[in-house]
Structure formats: structure tokens, C-alpha cells
């Protein structure tokens, strides 16, 4: 075969979409679709029709450009097996590695606290509204739930990993089915309450502030950054030796693009379906009650009384159960990340980074007590979940997902070719706006 024929054959092979690419599209999509999605309709719908339309326009650019920027940073590592920690160590030295370890821990730990509050509130709402049982002490409920989860995590972690993996796509399927099932209950309230004369761009309830606060929830909900490093390593091992790094970067971008489209379609359809069923006032009430949208929907159908259909009854109980399973799935996944981050900090400072010297069984137990204890305190205090996401969860995610890659583009020679791209300014602005949520929450 001539060299020309080899090139043509190689190009044909390059353009082929592989099964592994499809698996990663679904893997990235599945990582993002979790309990965080259950709060997005509340934040998006609380301002009415116009803000959620703006969020619809921003959804894909936020999901795609931010994750592509992080993937490019991961791709800049010298070896195809370098993960994000290795890559940051190469570019910024040991101090940079320590900073990333801190950011990684503090990006995930607040999310665990959020899910601790959420699962407590969801269980209490199910207990009182669906089971119609008398109120129980919040501290006891939170402690009991956390002890049960700690038991399963400590004694059956491997089994739980498998179970949670199997639950990802059934949860997504349920989310789509609920979105479709709500169609018969769509009302025109969102349109009848829409008044152009009462709209304002500025002010605490203006469109710009609502969209700004919504961006933080979007960064939180449309987030598959925890798996991007593993994804890039996998694609580099699969493609880079045969086709080069530039092609691998293009393939990663295409996979991220398709995952982002899938994610935006599912989440935004779910958000619009909830908004057409409820009203902005309902969304405000859901925020005040500090419960996810599925729990509020369950309570909404419960309030229909004896006149409700069997269909509505199924939705009522199904929504609550799906919410509990989704939150437990997200809690478990973020617990493992928090445990890894806390162990990493203890090993880095207590054992000078020598993992072989650390008694891992004892360390896991100490970390579990610290993590579960702090989660119980936060769950008992019951801070507003959307405010907690805006003040802690989303800003730290934005620092890792948006600002770190943009800083690397400015400073690292291997990423200099991406300087001056319009998408860089967009990603930087999204990161800064998300972090500025902290200032708004303190005002």
C-alpha cells in the first residue's frame, strides 16, 4: 500500500465514531445528571418565563465551553497517563498541587453538606405529606439517615459503587418520564402571569440578577468536571499514539459537545415541564420549604385530595421515591470524593505525602467521623440549599472548571495556542459571575 493510501485509510479510521466514544458521551451525561438537577427548575423558574429563556440560551455554551477548557488543561500533561493532579504539578509545581488538593476537597465537601440537608428535608416531606405521619425531630432524622448510609458505605462500599452505577440511567429515564407525565397537568399560568410592564432589568428581583444567580445553579447542575480527568486519560490512551494529540483534543471536544447537548435537552425539558405545571409562586414556595422540585411536585399532587386520579397518585409517590434515590446516589458519590480529598490532605500534611506510611483503615474511620459529623451539623441547622449552592458549591466548582484552565492558558506554554479565543472570555466571565455569588449572598 502506498503512503497516500495509508493516509486515506488512516483518515477514514480517524473519522469513525467508536462505541467507546458513545459510552463516554453517556458517562459524562450520567455524571452530571444527579440530585443537583432537582434544584435547577426552582432557581430557573422562580423569576418566570423570561429568565428561564435566557438560561436556555446560555445552557449549552456554559456546559460545553467550560468542560472543554478543563479537558484541554488535562490534555496538556506530558504523559498520556497524567491525570489533572499530575498535570497541575508539572505546570505549577508542588505548591500548585497542594492548592488543587485543597480546592478539590472544598469543591466536593459543601456539595455533600447540601445533599445531607436535601435528603433530610426530602425524607421529612415524604414522611409528613405522603405517609401522613406525625412530625419527627429533625436532628434524630438526620442522624438516623447518616448512620444508615455510613453503615452501608463502610461495610459495603464495593457493592454500593455497583448499585449506584446501575441507578444512573434508570434515574435519567425516570426524569424524562416524569417530564412527559407532567404534560397533562401543564397550565397557562406562566404565560398569564407574564406582564411586560412589570418587568425590570435591575433590582433584587430583576431579570439580570435572576439570570446571574441562575448561572451558579447551572454551573452546579451541568457539572461533570469530576470525571473529565479520567475521560481525557482514557481518550489519550485510545487515540494519541495513533492519531496525535490534536486529533485527540478534537475527539474529546466532540464527545463533550454531544454530552452537553444531551444534558441540556433533558434538564431544560424537565425544567420547562415543571414550570408549565407549577407557577413562579410555587417555585418560590419550594425554595422557602428548602426541598427539591420532585418533593414539591409530590406535595402538590398530594394536595389535590380525594379528587385526584390514579395517575396523579402514582406521580405523587413516584416523585418522592425517585428524589430520595437520586439524592442518595449523589450523596454516596460525593462522599467518596470527599473522603478521597480529606485523606489526601491528611496524608499530604500529616505524613508528608507518603501514602504508604498512612494507616488507611484508621484514616478512613477518622475521616468518616469528621465528614458525617459536619454533615449532621449542617443538616440540623438546615440552611437554604439554593443559597448554599450559590455561596459555596458553585463558586468552588467554577474556580476549578472555569478559572484554573483560563489561568493555565495565560501562563502555560503548552496551552498558549488557545490564547485570544472568544470562548476564553466567555468561560472567564461565567467563572467570575459564579464566584461573585458569594458577595451577593453576604449582602
Curated annotation (Swiss-Prot):
<feature type="transmembrane region" description="Helical">
    <location>
        <begin position="163"/>
        <end position="183"/>
    </location>
</feature>
<feature type="transmembrane region" description="Helical">
    <location>
        <begin position="259"/>
        <end position="279"/>
    </location>
</feature>
<keyword id="KW-0812">Transmembrane</keyword>
<feature type="transmembrane region" description="Helical">
    <location>
        <begin position="423"/>
        <end position="443"/>
    </location>
</feature>
<keyword id="KW-0997">Cell inner membrane</keyword>
<dbReference type="InterPro" id="IPR023726">
    <property type="entry name" value="Thr/Ser_transpt_TdcC"/>
</dbReference>
<keyword id="KW-0029">Amino-acid transport</keyword>
<keyword id="KW-0813">Transport</keyword>
<keyword id="KW-1003">Cell membrane</keyword>
<keyword id="KW-1133">Transmembrane helix</keyword>
<dbReference type="GO" id="GO:0015565">
    <property type="term" value="F:threonine efflux transmembrane transporter activity"/>
</dbReference>
<feature type="transmembrane region" description="Helical">
    <location>
        <begin position="385"/>
        <end position="405"/>
    </location>
</feature>
<keyword id="KW-0472">Membrane</keyword>
<dbReference type="GO" id="GO:0015194">
    <property type="term" value="F:L-serine transmembrane transporter activity"/>
</dbReference>
<feature type="transmembrane region" description="Helical">
    <location>
        <begin position="95"/>
        <end position="115"/>
    </location>
</feature>
<dbReference type="InterPro" id="IPR018227">
    <property type="entry name" value="Amino_acid_transport_2"/>
</dbReference>
<feature type="transmembrane region" description="Helical">
    <location>
        <begin position="319"/>
        <end position="339"/>
    </location>
</feature>
<dbReference type="GO" id="GO:0015293">
    <property type="term" value="F:symporter activity"/>
</dbReference>
<feature type="transmembrane region" description="Helical">
    <location>
        <begin position="45"/>
        <end position="65"/>
    </location>
</feature>
<protein>
    <recommendedName>
        <fullName>Threonine/serine transporter TdcC</fullName>
    </recommendedName>
</protein>
<dbReference type="GO" id="GO:0005886">
    <property type="term" value="C:plasma membrane"/>
</dbReference>
<keyword id="KW-0769">Symport</keyword>
<feature type="transmembrane region" description="Helical">
    <location>
        <begin position="363"/>
        <end position="383"/>
    </location>
</feature>
<comment type="function">
    <text>Involved in the import of threonine and serine into the cell, with the concomitant import of a proton (symport system).</text>
</comment>
<feature type="transmembrane region" description="Helical">
    <location>
        <begin position="140"/>
        <end position="160"/>
    </location>
</feature>
<comment type="similarity">
    <text>Belongs to the amino acid/polyamine transporter 2 family. SdaC/TdcC subfamily.</text>
</comment>
<feature type="transmembrane region" description="Helical">
    <location>
        <begin position="207"/>
        <end position="227"/>
    </location>
</feature>
<feature type="transmembrane region" description="Helical">
    <location>
        <begin position="24"/>
        <end position="44"/>
    </location>
</feature>
